[in-house]
Amino acid sequence: MLKIRLKRFGRKAQPCYRIVVTDSRVKRDGKALEEVGFYNPLTDETHLKFNRIVERLKTGAQPTETVRNIFLKAKVFDALT
């Protein structure tokens, strides 16, 4: 099953995350199929590729709870309807 989840990078105590599409069996920081966004929790900065995210959601990719909350803030799910 495909998951849309966070992949951590950045320095110690200064996390940044890439929002990636990956197989659910792959490690958190393992190889991703596609990068569809970026999230910085320290500055609350978010960059999303809306078209690719909507396409992946329509094909059955499941977002994790944290990613779902980021998508709700950015109103990604409004584009599905």
Swiss-Prot record:
Transmembrane segments: none annotated. GO terms for molecular function: structural constituent of ribosome. Keywords: Chloroplast, Plastid, Ribonucleoprotein, Ribosomal protein. The keyword Disulfide bond does not apply. It is found in: Plastid, Chloroplast. The keyword Nucleus does not apply. GO terms for cellular component: chloroplast; mitochondrion; small ribosomal subunit. Its main location: plastid. Pfam families: Ribosomal_S16. This is Small ribosomal subunit protein bS16c. Belongs to the bacterial ribosomal protein bS16 family. The gene is rps16.
